[in-house]
């Protein structure tokens, strides 16, 4: 095809795959969709991306971007042109005060943790696939993970983005020279962004609905919150990238705030005989705050009986045995579907503060019926096992489904 012939003029043949085997391999992600790309191109730089997008536009061919391919809903597969940005996209820089980090899309999330750990800082988004997922996918899919919630997801910690638009234009929203040039070359683009912003804000009901939608955990669909959060059109453009799944632009670099990493941590796996009781306990724990006004509970992850069964949780197996052989108060004989776990984490700046947090949580939970005693551990080798269970629960549940089904 003409596109391929032109692409070979600036992309070496060894980085262009058209054979059936490698196209099949690259047409796979962590979801259940199957699309086989016609061409796979391993990109190595921003200039290549710009030229590829302009070329695809001339030939009216769709293209899809892929980093690690750990997405669950088909974001990283294509039946047209698949542009891979993994290897050779691993650059980074950390600000002198360690409060900002600039990243290319191909660096793995776990690697970012390792880079920041010596400075007592961390990368806030923490998807379960963080040991494989890359920054490009984490940001563009708004993969918020288990602990960052809504207060520290990609949208909240993003400061600026360097992107390549469909026409090949490179825009760095954190660079004044780039912004000024873009205002000249894309004046109408900026005008339309501002018009959308003003229309959204003029509709009070819509604006309030958007604020509410993003006050709860929400990682699907295009991110509309920037239209009510920001005045500057370049801030809006940068934050529109979060959750866009690569449909609006290619993310070549992102600058994000880092988060303070508490040195003292403790976790507990709390078990309840009903999911209702577990949810009531979570609501109560959310109200706990320390002397400094910070939340006492930093993370609370609910695992239903199916999640526990999929990882052969020992407490679930014990519970299942008990209800089969005897009757537990408030539980129907043989009904194993009620047991619910809440993986709870608290963090502190000192061991004394950590002990105070644990006591406050234990006191709060005394008003609820737990299946097992509340037992926090501050030993990393112990609580890391709890979080490994949580990280592994999704693929484990998926593994229990019947062949050929998707749920």
Predicted region positions:
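Glycine-rich anion/phosphate-binding loop at the beta-strand->alpha-helix junction
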Residues: 134, 141-142
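C-terminal substrate-binding/cap subdomain adjacent to the FAD-binding core in PCMH-type
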Residues: 138-140, 147-154, 158-391, 395
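Glycine-rich, histidine-containing beta strand-loop boundary motifs that form or position
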Residues: 20, 65-69, 76, 105, ...
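N-terminal glycine-rich flavin-associated loop
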Residues: 7, 31-63, 81-128, 143-195, ...
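Short, acidic, Ser/Thr-enriched surface-loop or helix-capping motifs
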Residues: 71, 96, 134, 165-166, ...
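N-terminal flexible segment immediately upstream of the FAD-binding catalytic core
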Residues: 1-58, 68-99, 128, 151, ...
